[in-house]
Every structure is written in C-alpha cells, then in structure tokens.
Amino acid sequence: MSSQPLNVNEDEIAKFEQVASQWWDLTGDFKPLHQINPLRVQFISQHIALQVEGIDSKNGFYDMQIIDVGCGGGILSESLAKLGANVTGIDMGTEPLNVAKLHALETGVSINYQKITAEEKALENPGTFDVVTCMEMLEHVPDPASVIQACSTLVKPGGLIFFSTLNKSIKSYLLAILAAEKLLKIVPDGTHDHDKFIRPSQLIGWAEEHGLKCIDASGIHYNPITGNHKLNDSLDVNYILCCRKL
C-alpha cells in the first residue's frame, strides 16, 4: 500500500455528501449541472468524432472506454453510457456514488462506479482509456496538477482528455461566487473557493508537462434568465479544454 496521502479535500467531500440526495433533482442544488450537461456532451461528442478515427457521433461510441474522473452522482457518466461507451465513473464521495449507482439501476444504464482517486486508478489501469473526462473537479482537490498527471497516465496514446473548470479572474469571482452563490442562489453558498480556481494558462501548462497537447480551449457562457449555456471565445469564467495524449 502507498503511504502517500490521498489527493482529497475532506471538507469538499463533506459538502457534496450532504446534498447528494439532490443530485438527480432537476430543480435542486445540482440544477446548474443538469443545465450545462448537454453542452458538455456536445463538446465531447464533436471532438471524439473529429479526433478519433472510425468514430461517428451519430452512430454512438460503442466499444470506447471512457473514464469520468470526479463523476459525482453520474450526470455526465450516464449521458456518455447512453451514447454506447463503456463508462467507468470514479469519485471519493460515498453518498454521491451510492446515488449514481441507484440511478443507473433505475435507468438501466451499465456503468462501473468506483470509490478511488484518479492517482490510484492510474496506478491500477495505466493507458487503458480512449477518453478521460474531468469536469468541474480540479477546483475541489488540493493538488490539481496531480489529477492532470493521473488523467494523462490513464488515457491511451492518441486518446483525448477533457477538462472543465473556472478561471481565476475578477469576473469569475463576481459571476460564479458573488452572483451565482450569494445573490441569485443558483448554487449553494460556499460551493466554490475563488483561491482554488485555475487560470487556463496554468492548466494548459500542467497538461503540456504531462504529455498532453491542448487542441481546443472554449469558454462557456451561462444565461441565468434562460438557463442556457453556449460556447464562446471568452475564458474569463467557465471554460472547457480538449487535450490529446501525445
């Protein structure tokens, strides 16, 4: 057994444990994740179709091995599994994983959920996955660079990794924390810590250090009135990356 401490923030885990029962409530605390999920799936699907030979998003992702790092209650994991992929979802939250497993049973979707860190999984299954997704997770761990390294280890050469997180900017504080948490109450107060947000240049730098090439960096714009999300060129607040393993 490794004596290295786990790359886990227990306070962050506890926050999501407390609200795990709401994960699949479309009007609850996780409503923003449900609203953003179609855009994430579209972004991932389009890049898989463009970058992976022999794959057409219209025909599904059958036989593809995808791992969803920090899967929580399984919103993205289920969407990818419904497209035909063989999906593994990993998280360190017991209750979110229990919710994810139960919901998968209810919907008849087959997903391999595991309570394990990205680093531990990388030691167990290096170079196993065609695609790795790591959505809205990096800002919740003590060492995001370690997670990026683990994701690079998990993916096959030529495979794709998708990251999404929040930029460490004044605008992200104003919109993601002051507006979304404290004024509009779109997400629970205390969900995010601006000090843990990550500048795109920093994330891309870590990715390159671990053998990844960023092939797309797009901003995600949220309209609080309509609840819709769309991609744009501004990385000021939410952003999503597609990287390829060299």
From Swiss-Prot:
SUPFAM superfamilies: S-adenosyl-L-methionine-dependent methyltransferases (SSF53335). It comes from the Bacteria. Keywords: Methyltransferase, S-adenosyl-L-methionine, Transferase, Ubiquinone biosynthesis. S-adenosyl-L-methionine binds at R40, G70, D91, M135. One of its GO terms (biological process) is methylation. Pathway: Cofactor biosynthesis; ubiquinone biosynthesis. CDD domains: AdoMet_MTases. Coiled coil: none annotated. It holds the Pfam family Methyltransf_23. Its EC number is 2.1.1.222, 2.1.1.64. It is an enzyme of class 2 (transferase). It catalyses: a 3-demethylubiquinol + S-adenosyl-L-methionine = a ubiquinol + S-adenosyl-L-homocysteine + H(+); a 3-(all-trans-polyprenyl)benzene-1,2-diol + S-adenosyl-L-methionine = a 2-methoxy-6-(all-trans-polyprenyl)phenol + S-adenosyl-L-homocysteine + H(+). GO terms for molecular function: 2-polyprenyl-6-hydroxyphenol methylase activity; 3-demethylubiquinol 3-O-methyltransferase activity; polyprenyldihydroxybenzoate methyltransferase activity. Transmembrane segments: none annotated. PANTHER family: METHYLTRANSFERASE (PTHR43464), UBIQUINONE BIOSYNTHESIS O-METHYLTRANSFERASE, MITOCHONDRIAL (PTHR43464:SF19). O-methyltransferase that catalyzes the 2 O-methylation steps in the ubiquinone biosynthetic pathway. Belongs to the methyltransferase superfamily. UbiG/COQ3 family. This is Ubiquinone biosynthesis O-methyltransferase. It comes from Colwellia psychrerythraea (strain 34H / ATCC BAA-681).
